[in-house]
């Protein structure tokens, strides 16, 4: 990842109980320079940290951070709990706090993210971008609005809702005066048969997915953020998936990055997807996912990755039994 013009690399080896290795370097030149490296001593159950000179932290500060670095939290988290002087870690933490958009998976989380972004779009630039993107994607959407729905609830239901562990981002402006406030999108369509409006519940999943992706795309291009999306192709025609990725590649001039998973093999045939950016996942006997970069298979440049994968020459294909069920 990049902070300004400087390149950083953070490496982690961990499971649910321990962080076994954590290394942060940056590139003041063509060669990397160590900021810190932490290792987990399994025999003693202790964390050991080797500090690089570029951090310029005092021994007292290093000791304070080490004291807060327990086996299952990162050095960056321990740094936030320590009263130490400013260093390069300030910028690194700020990057992950503000420019890392983690995977948005559930439909309600996606909807909440899009609504929150558009609600805070005071100058209307995001909305203009979204409408142009959707129209360029062959949707006849002329406008997008956010409307507030009021639902009258009794005291018993109010108490029930207040006690529920609802997911973060489920946009409920909580139950004031016995009224439940819920926001939803309304889409205006312009067609040869006239204009009409549809609530988000009546739009197709593909339309809504493109709306969310357009919001993500705008924010990535503006903020230079890293965005992680699970199953990017969900509910999308392949041409729409391809259009989104090509638009990101063509428009991204800054440090923004897009990391995504997909089951759509058609991307293996595309020239705009660099082979060194493709990774295959497969489950080992212990159930853990193992990742292998396409370039590690030594595939000849004239051989199609798509055909090689279909022939089982790359990552193993899913083993399927008989289509006849006893």
Segments predicted by a language model, with ranges:
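Short, mixed charged/polar active-site loops
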Residues: 7-9, 31-33, 193-197, 288-289
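C-terminal lobe/lid and adjacent interdomain/linker elements of RecA-like ASCE P-loop ATPase modules
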Residues: 223, 243-326
């Amino acid at each position: 990842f990049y902070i300004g013009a400087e390149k950083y690399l953070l490496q982690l080896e961990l499971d649910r109980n321990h962080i076994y290795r954590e290394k942060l370097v940056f590139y003041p030149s063509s060669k990397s320079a160590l900021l810190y490296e932490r290792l987990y001593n399994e025999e003693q159950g202790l964390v050991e940290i080797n500090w690089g000179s570029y951090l310029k932290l005092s021994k007292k500060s290093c000791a304070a951070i080490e004291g807060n670095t327990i086996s299952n939290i990162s050095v960056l988290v321990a740094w936030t709990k320590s009263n130490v002087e400013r260093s390069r870690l300030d910028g690194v933490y700020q990057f992950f706090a503000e420019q890392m958009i983690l995977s948005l998976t559930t439909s309600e989380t996606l909807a909440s993210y899009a609504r929150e972004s558009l609600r805070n779009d005071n100058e209307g630039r995001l909305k203009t971008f979204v409408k142009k993107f959707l129209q360029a994607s062959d949707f006849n959407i002329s406008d997008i609005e956010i409307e507030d729905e009021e639902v009258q609830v009794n005291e018993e239901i109010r108490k029930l809702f207040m006690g529920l562990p609802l997911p973060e981002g489920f946009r409920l402006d909580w139950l004031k005066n016995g009224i439940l406030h819920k926001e939803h999108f309304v889409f205006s369509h312009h067609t040869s048969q006239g204009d009409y409006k549809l609530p988000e519940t009546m739009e197709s999943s593909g339309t809504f997915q493109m709306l969310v992706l357009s919001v993500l795309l705008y924010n990535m291009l503006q903020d230079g953020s890293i965005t992680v999306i699970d199953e990017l192709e969900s509910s999308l025609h392949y041409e729409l998936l391809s259009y989104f990725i090509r638009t990101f590649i063509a428009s991204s001039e800054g440090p923004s990055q897009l990391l995504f998973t997909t089951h759509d093999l058609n991307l293996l045939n595309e020239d705009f997807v660099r082979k060194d950016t493709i990774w295959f996942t497969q489950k080992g006997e212990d159930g853990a996912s193992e990742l292998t970069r396409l370039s590690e298979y030594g595939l000849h440049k004239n051989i199609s990755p798509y055909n090689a994968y279909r022939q089982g020459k790359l990552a193993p294909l899913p083993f399927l039994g008989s289509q006849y069920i006893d």
